[in-house]
């Protein structure tokens, strides 16, 4: 199937909310080895975000049930085995994406914007792996995630406006990484606040095309800041961090 057919198939799959099919089509496009257009890049990102998001959500539900069944060995074992099955699926998806990033997407990225987009994606998928990892594997995935985010962050500060939705989305997810994975709320809040304040200061540079995306991410940054600040003051809040 040629590239334009695969892209069309991915769009059909998105309309039908069949994200596994959408991801398979966009994986095939990526493996063609040609740099993706912005539209193709977004299709790939949306597909895998939904595919992995479903497993992350399932994993959280089953992990919670597993903890609640302490004392009932049979139920707990069933929950554990099911969690491990979901975990294996999640790991396979993340490794798929990371493979595409390493082999095709990052090496082929000619623009700073694409490089930041893909390095952020690398940070995200190592973060998802770290959520279900333990021991040495946890340490490695956390380090890889932080390095990818940091590399993306350096480029975004040099090459992109503070109001650019990709730069803002990176700040959002990197701050969630600090809060949830490294458990460093001060760093999380500082990063999110700086990104928000810098964007506010340059609101006049907001590109009309990306106005909606940028303001939505700014809202998520502010929501997270509010939540994290209240949690650190001892209020019990539900940690429903917004992510991009």
From Swiss-Prot:
Q: Which GO terms describe its cellular component?
A: cytoplasm
What keywords is this UniProt entry annotated with?
Answer: Acetylation, Cytoplasm
- Note one Pfam family from the annotation: 14-3-3
Q: Where is this site: Interaction with phosphoserine on interacting protein?
A: 56, 127
The record's subcellular locations are: Cytoplasm
The superkingdom listed in its UniProt entry is Eukaryota
| Mitochondrion keyword on record | no
Query: Where the protein is mainly located, per its record?
Result: cytoplasm
Which Gene Ontology biological process is one annotated for this entry?
A: signal transduction
Give all N-acetylmethionine modified positions. Answer: 1
Q: Which SUPFAM superfamilies match?
A: 14-3-3 protein
Q: Which InterPro entries match?
A: 14-3-3, 14-3-3_CS, 14-3-3_dom_sf, 14-3-3_domain
Q: How does it assemble?
A: Homodimer, and heterodimer with other family members.
- Please report which protein family the annotation says this sequence is part of: Belongs to the 14-3-3 family.
Protein name as catalogued: 14-3-3 protein beta/alpha-A
Q: What is the lineage of its organism?
A: Eukaryota, Metazoa, Chordata, Craniata, Vertebrata
Name the gene.
ywhaba
